[in-house]
Swiss-Prot record:
Entry's localization field: Mitochondrion inner membrane
Native source organism of the sequence: Nicotiana tabacum
Transit peptide region: 1-56
Chemical reaction(s) catalysed: a quinol + 2 Fe(III)-[cytochrome c](out) = a quinone + 2 Fe(II)-[cytochrome c](out) + 2 H(+)(out)
Any single GO BP term: mitochondrial electron transport, ubiquinol to cytochrome c
Protein name per Swiss-Prot or TrEMBL: Cytochrome b-c1 complex subunit Rieske-5, mitochondrial
Mitochondrial matrix topology ranges: 57-105
Ligand binding ([2Fe-2S] cluster): C211, H213, C230, H233
């Protein structure tokens, strides 16, 4: 009886498999030639193969908690044994490290504070170096001022010195020169200015020897007023360096100067 039941089960299973094959098989046969009425196209076969492959690949790269294949393995081991393009997160690993030693934290704070202090000091030095590099050098400062010895200048004479690339006239005036400079009517001057405003010591007159017209150098002890005469365009200056005649619009410029001693003059 058991053998007969087994044979019946095997025959029914074979019948179901054959019927399923003919159901899925795209080929149909006719009674006359027993040949298929149509042949499968390569594109249909390729599409069916790709569908099966995609389904297999999607199932193979599904997350670990869905497949259950590597549920008992760590995330790293599961990723090696079951390669997947999806990112699998290990939600079970929440290890927390204990806080560090207080002495080590204090040392770390000390190192960081020291590093910041050194960094700030270096930045400060760089800024100071940059600012100091923009200031004038000692040579330039030396040329900016000029010290002149007045002891060798005789009364009534004029000495020319060079300061900042320009000639400077230093005249030691006599009493007659001083009285003549103070007797001039300011209303008659083109650039009105009293003699006391142009000198710090009435005996000494210090002016820049450049004509205010076009920058020529006037000649001392010349002209119609006993001061300076510009040969370029005929400008006349008096004994105080004021313009009295000619095209020059202004008086000779007075530089910044001071008396260091009785016979020492510092220009600049």
């Amino acid at each position: 009886m058991l053998r007969i039941a087994g044979r019946k089960l095997s025959s029914s299973a074979a019948a179901r498999s054959s019927s399923a094959f003919f159901t899925r098989n795209p080929f149909t046969f006719t009674d006359d030639s027993s040949s298929p009425t149509r042949s499968p196209s390569p594109t249909s076969l390729a599409s069916q193969f790709l569908d099966q492959f995609r389904g297999f690949s999607s199932n193979s790269v599904s997350p670990a908690h869905q497949t259950g294949l590597v549920s008992d393995l760590p995330a790293t081991v599961a990723a090696i044994k079951n390669p997947s393009s999806k990112i699998v997160y290990d939600d079970s690993n929440h290890e927390r490290y204990p806080p560090g030693d207080p002495s080590k934290r204090a040392f770390a704070y000390f190192v960081l504070t020291g590093g910041r202090f050194v960094y700030a000091s270096l930045v400060r030095l760089l800024i100071l170096k940059f600012v100091l590099s923009m200031s004038a050098s000692k040579d330039v400062l030396a040329l900016a001022s000029l010290e002149v010895d007045l002891s060798s200048i005789e009364p009534g004479t004029t000495v020319t010195v060079k300061w900042r690339g320009k000639p400077v006239f230093i005249r030691r005036r006599t009493d007659e020169d001083i009285n003549l400079a103070n007797s001039v009517d300011l209303g008659s001057l083109r650039d009105p200015q009293q003699d006391a405003e142009r000198v710090k010591n009435p005996e000494w007159l210090v002016v820049i020897g450049v004509c205010t017209h076009l920058g020529c150098i006037p000649l001392p002890n010349a002209g119609d007023f006993g001061g300076w005469f510009c040969p370029c365009h005929g400008s006349h200056y008096d004994i105080s360096g004021r313009i009295r005649k000619g095209p020059a619009p202004y008086n000779l410029e007075v530089p910044t100067y001071s008396f260091m001693e009785e016979n020492k003059l510092l220009i600049g």
